[in-house]
Amino acid sequence: MFTFKTITKILKWLAVGFLAISVLSVLVYRWVPVYVTPLMLIRCGESIINGKTPAIHHRWVPLEEMSKYMPVAVIASEDANFLSHHGFDFDAIRSAAKDMKKGKRRRGASTISQQTAKNVFLTPSSTWLRKGLEAYFTVLIELLWSKERIMEVYLNSIEMGPQIYGVEAVAIRHFGCQASELTRANCALIAATLPNPLKFSSLKPSRYMRKRQKQIEHEMRFVPLLR
């Protein structure tokens, strides 16, 4: 029978082990490309359950081989303060809280850093445990990665359509070109899908999508180039 002291010791070593593995994982991904994420595997499982053929359309490309407008577009669309915050946009969080209090439609306050932490290290569940781990990994990547690296991993790992992950894959499948050849308008259209890339498509954009694309193109004028 385990004593309280034994249980405490086991929990202590589990915590130390988790800390060591998580820090090591973040350090490894500081240099190593992210080829597979938990979400990719989950989507494959969902395809099998639904009787569909599982597939992962993904091709890693370094940031310098992407259109210079792609980081600008997602900053304008997803995280206007990406270059200045340290992982959490507290102004956006306060605004979202006020909107919820007034009964307005909930706006997203998740930063690119938070989304990257979730995409690479966690599952898309909405539990408090996952949210806590997301905050933890966000702090780690902000401490151990550069902003350029966070953006590079984000643009290579994020879901951009059914079975499509990363900017190179969506460029090839939806625009018939490489990520480096995407135009300013292409990048704005891709960014417009990111709140829900399974609902909004850059291949067959709706009227709403075209309107959102124009808004993002306008906002891009106020975002500096990342490289």
Language model features by range: what are they?
Residues 2-227:
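Juxtamembrane regions of bacterial inner-membrane/periplasmic proteins
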